[in-house]
Amino acid sequence: MCIRDSSYTDFKARENVPFHRGFGDMDANDIVWYFNSINPLTNPDSRNDTGGQMGGTLLETSVVDDSTARFHWDAFAGHTLFKTFTDLEEGMGIFSKKAYDERGEEWVKDNMIGTGPFQLVEWVESERVEMDAVTNHWRKTPYVNRVEILFVPENATRRAMLETTQAYAGNLPIKDWQSMFDMGFGLAPESIYTVTQIAMSGNYWEYSHIKTGETLERNRDISKPHVGDPYEGGGTTFNGDTPSMQQSLKVRQALSRTIDRDTINEVILGGLGEAHHLGYVWNNDPIWQENADTWSLPYDPDGAKALLTEAGYPDGFDIEWYVGTGDYETQQAVAADWLSKLNVNVTFDRQDYSSWRPTIVARTNSDIFGGCCWGPLLWPFEWTSNTSSFPGGYGIGMELPQSKASFNIKNSSQDPAELKAAAVDMLQYLSDWALFPGIVQQPNAAMYNPDVVSWQEMRPYLWMRLGGMRSFEYIQLK
């Protein structure tokens, strides 16, 4: 790796790293082709889940020679290389350009040609993934010959499969942990905090694109009580005092304050989690701890009912909440409280994520959902709530002027004080406008039986993916 200045970085491709199925060794041409394919700035048709994060960071990638790829930065800061090239968040594996050129786009969609210690055998959506070990792998030859990842949405079924050794590792609700520990089960080497939160989607408040400056076409559906329109009545300047902005603020405040976080932790999480109040931030982050008194939310159903009455909803309203196909006991508890205290009736959207995702990519979603993401607050996680990932990338159904401002600072500054100030400003904004309330925070990790499996090494991560299971090449059967 060679960094000339903050405008570009040259990377040398590791030699003798073969692609699966005989598609030759990886070189700079593969790297450049892949990154330019997933980057919305170089490929407007990209719908890559992670490529959308590159907006405002990576301009393009070019070939210097067969062994050297050059990354041209739009912005560069201390986190840039770590965030872009590691799998701490989601990671971006390099796929084979030769496979794409020879077999075509449709073939490579069904036949993942990568360089990892396992190669794909079969992927059946919402059912299973099968992978075989790569012998004599350049980095680490796995101890096991095959790994099967099964889609099992029911918690009780996953637990039964672990107890009967139908499965060797899996993700279980935290309330089951102690009883599993008592039976001798343990947690995988790495764990992380998981946050259950609510993104008040539909609040598309940016007027122009963060990068191009083009005017955005957005449907700000103020028929949804939680959605406000700062341009209501015309105009091009953000106005937080329009009727819908003030009414929706009261609605969001009311919903945020009718969440019995402590009871949810005790009853659903078995007291192993803790109350959580604000999206994007972990409770153990120093910035949260310095501002916890200001940003914490009371449990105040009576005050919330008064706010709804002021907003024009004394008899409540209906709202939709996307929760996907997984466990949603926590969300059900919140919905029950909203119904009994505020007469707010929740309809849960349980469709598969792959079917629902296009609505957040297209910025048409206006129903609340869990949102994303969290991690080091000096990193620019604001990409999820502004237009830097549009078109083509993920978003949480909100595009916010303060998110745009904080993102631009974090994406280019290396001044700790400036980075911290940008983080505080963003969180204060979310708190003031009640846009991203938290519910609970809990530790999360894969669970396995150490009498059957040895699993001593695992790369760290920020977000739960595949139930916290990764680094399968280090699993050994006893």
Which residues make up each language-model segment?
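Long beta-strand-rich cores associated with HINT superfamily self-processing modules
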Residues: 448-478
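Active-site-proximal polar cores
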Residues: 439
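Mature extracytoplasmic/periplasmic domains
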Residues: 270-293, 445-452
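Surface-exposed binding/hinge segments that line
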Residues: 12, 47-99, 451
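Surface loops and adjacent helix of pleckstrin homology
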Residues: 14, 73-74, 134, 442
